[in-house]
């Protein structure tokens, strides 16, 4: 058994915790910091205070455990070599228990997709939220309904960070890893912090599972686990023995092993079981035997922690200092659903939600279907197009119409969204982004639909785009999307993503009466002296009136054909089409005056701005805070409205010399900013199916800041000092780069795949792919002659004449050489694979070589002519 050591806590967390503690206790930060670092030592007063506070709630579940677990369920497995339990009992364990206060901890549960890891993580999260911790979560699971058991591809995980201060991310890396099988260990061990706590379900580490996970030997017997505190727990054995009194099938019994893990973690971090017990009883109220079995397994895991001496050193994360109010733990999909309901109520409209099930947006449909009492009508259509069309129809009849989907569905809905835009009807389109293209990564986050949301419709079809930045902000983003759609009579795209949608955090419930009343353009009367004009616009918002069918005298046409301004009659007039196109665009641009300005956070005197949008908010904000605390000058700003941008965006951008844009795509916001504001940006881009961690951004931002202002200076000095040699150097060095133009990591990945397919060494493939080395001896004349003979005249020509034509000519040999080399390499591979013993193939090889020699001779003649 590994030596008991405190969890590794980053210094910045200790400082944040000390500052909060000093503020509430009226003591100095230094004193609070000393208390935190010394609380695990029983000789110091703060420890006594912590133990008195902690033991009261702990004893209550302990007493219940003794009453329920009368049989020696835990005592027998405890006598295994894994723990030294024969010398302990519950009373001695409680007396010897130590409680270490820590400001934060990150825990990751990992196992097969059928092991209930999402449930365990959610229950621990909810219990911590009720206790009063601030928290953030990161669920991760395979796209398959039932992924291959015991394989790394089938691993499901749930990460949660709990803290006694305000946090914005689920943690950089887990301090505690609960691995239910070898595959879970294989998938997540590399993320565990040094000296982290590793809890293994030892019953799953048999030869079959070890090989299935890709291990050659049992990882517990290797050096791989050195540097971690390893705790082996016989979870399956404990489950079987605890539930033997229940009349349940064997497989059903083993499904409860996740409750063993939850009970043990609850003991280790001083969480009460009562809330989870209540949840189990409610969940299985129609299956009381199953409910009792799960509660028994839960208490068995808790009791194991009490009994086993290795778990006597426990941890406590105090309540966070959150603003007063009523809180609930909420994920992004639920928050978004509630925001739509609130918007409908504040507009005094019924809510219609038309959708087709798609990951990860389906939970919105499920949640809204529970709220018929708020006049919510949900419609599950046969496909994405039908769902969108039904929503447009509902909007025409005066409902707050919403349709929801993810990337592939947004593509299918695009024509119907154009219809709503042309008809100028209010519609909220929810797009929960995921990895693409096509089916892509259905359960992984990505921000790759921004450009599609902006421009993914035929014709000139601008519309507002709003992005949720966190699970709790999803409520307000949905409410804002509703406000804009109704006020400006337009479709609005609301962007979320899998990280926001499935992640959770505590959310302070708003006072409904404090939410703005939402007006509408609904009308039941004529809007001019001459009657009703369906496209007679409001002079402030440019929105047309909203008249629903059945109102006498307000009959009018809607549809996809262009309408005449004012009357709404079908019109093919060219001037009218220009006018209507401009008016629709101006209506959207005008919204910039009706949204909050872009705010700057951090060090506003900095030269560097970190600019993000959507779900990158938490990682960016936390990274900037850390950098500021280290003395690094940097500021941040974040878009929640990405079309139109806030009206002060240009002013904000002009205040900074360097703009860094982190995105979970390949630079889509950067492209928009460059096109709109003519500013240069530096992207931090990632499409790995994972969100940014604060540590990852902190390191990359600091590296970029250190490089700003210096990377161009040596080049400038070189050009001024020696103009002629510098030009020659640039030509000689840059042209080979243009020939390759491929990032190093892509070259390596390509070489590895090619080597594997051809059965040759990676080194040989790299040599063939290298731009500086020939793939075959016959290529030597081409490679050697081109740079020497052709480059020098080009350089001199560029130097002697500043016109554009010679510069263009200078580029042509580079392109030609790239094409030639690719052709030659393909030819070489064809010849290598051809069986030369066959007569027809001999002729083929001969023809190819003759053609190549002919080309080389022509080239030599061209060179002589040029000279």
Residue ranges with predicted function:
Residues 171, 225-228, 232-236, 444-491, ...:
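Conserved thiamine diphosphate
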Residues 322, 330-339, 347, 477, ...:
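Flexible, low-complexity linker and terminal segments
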Residues 104-105, 241-243, 310-325, 343-350, ...:
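Gly-rich Lys/Arg/Thr-decorated short loops/hinges at beta-loop-alpha junctions or inter-strand turns
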Residues 1-33, 39, 726-767:
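Intrinsically disordered, low-complexity regulatory segments in eukaryotic proteins
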Residues 64-67, 76-85, 279-312, 547-588:
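Helix-enriched interaction subdomains in cytosolic or periplasmic regions
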Residues 86-347:
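Active-site cofactor/cluster-binding pocket
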Residues 94, 101-194, 338, 343, ...:
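Thiamine diphosphate
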